[in-house]
């Protein structure tokens, strides 16, 4: 186990020396994956669906804050929607407008969460985002997670329905707008997942804040289990047939990543914890002190 802590210390030391380069490298990779995923799912305008375009946009986004990546991703989706029909563009633009009203008001600094959520869905481990946010952030991160979830399901619907939305009269366009909005916001699976993510986030956040041994590990495992249970109950109640294999393995993968996050952000030695008591003129204080695990890296 000590070797893991040594590796952690070396990685943290390396990051502290090259943090600017590391942050930009991570941002670039995330941007490339985001633009590639958009083009792969809703790349209806062939000119912009090229990997070269995704690479160029990622390079541009790397020199700006993460929010610019979100804005460029939004613009790319809207252009692809325009190539399908005006109806697709109008509904998608309205959905983005609603999300940005809430997003910019509550979570303007959580752009990376909005980007990571659809990517996590594509990698079949969506619950890793709410679990990670609950460990490292506050429950308000659920707003950003919700925005990313809506974007994923919106793209998933358009990937299937785009061929039926092209062309048509003004009357037909109005019908397409209503159908598109209905299919997105009345998607039972979307609402089941959103509820599961909200409950999972609250459970993980509440448990990891408790003064109990191995709070983070318990929180991660509980969050993964809660996600499986809530989605399963929702599927049965709403008549949605989800892939339980993907759900279980995705939750296990998310739990593993959660434990890795604990190693880097909350490594403590519970065997050396102490309960302290002291007082001042007004209060008695009962404090539980748990020392951090710190190891010295061997010199080469």
Model-derived segments and spans:
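Short, Lys/Arg-rich, polar N-terminal cytosolic tail immediately upstream
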Residues: 1-18
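Short, highly charged, low-complexity non-transmembrane loops/tails of multi-pass membrane proteins
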Residues: 268-300
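Alpha-helical membrane-embedded segments
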Residues: 143-151, 225-231, 247-267
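Structural signature of hydrophobic alpha-helical transmembrane segments
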Residues: 42-52, 80-94, 186-195
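Generic multipass alpha-helical transmembrane bundles of integral membrane proteins
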Residues: 120-121, 129-240
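Juxtamembrane/interface segments at transmembrane-helix termini
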Residues: 162, 209-210, 240-244, 260-277
């Amino acid at each position: 186990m000590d070797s893991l802590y040594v590796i952690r210390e070396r990685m943290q030391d390396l990051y502290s020396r090259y943090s600017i380069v590391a942050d930009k490298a991570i941002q670039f990779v995330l941007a490339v994956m985001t633009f590639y995923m958009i083009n792969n799912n809703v790349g209806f305008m062939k000119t912009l669906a090229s990997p070269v375009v995704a690479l160029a946009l990622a390079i541009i986004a790397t020199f700006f804050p993460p929010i610019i990546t979100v804005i460029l991703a939004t613009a790319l989706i809207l252009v692809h929607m325009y190539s399908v029909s005006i109806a697709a563009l109008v509904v998608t633009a309205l959905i983005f407008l609603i999300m940005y009203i809430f997003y910019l008001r509550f979570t303007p600094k959580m752009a990376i969460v909005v980007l990571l959520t659809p990517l996590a869905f594509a990698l079949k481990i969506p619950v890793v985002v709410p679990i990670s946010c609950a460990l490292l952030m506050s429950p308000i991160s659920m707003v950003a997670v919700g925005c990313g979830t809506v974007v994923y399901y919106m793209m998933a619907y358009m990937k299937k329905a785009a061929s039926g939305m092209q062309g048509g009269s003004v009357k037909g366009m109005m019908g397409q707008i209503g159908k598109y909005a209905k299919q997105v916001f009345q998607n039972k699976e979307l609402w089941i997942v959103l509820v599961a993510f909200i409950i999972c986030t609250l459970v993980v956040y509440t448990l990891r804040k408790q003064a109990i041994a191995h709070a983070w590990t318990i929180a991660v495992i509980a969050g993964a289990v809660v996600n499986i249970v809530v989605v399963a109950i929702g599927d049965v109640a709403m008549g949605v047939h989800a892939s339980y294999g993907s759900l279980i393995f995705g939750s296990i993968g998310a739990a593993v990543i959660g434990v890795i996050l604990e190693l880097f952000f909350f490594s403590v030695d519970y065997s050396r914890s102490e309960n302290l008591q002291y007082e001042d003129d007004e209060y008695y204080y009962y404090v539980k002190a748990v020392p951090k695990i710190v190891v010295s890296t061997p010199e080469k």
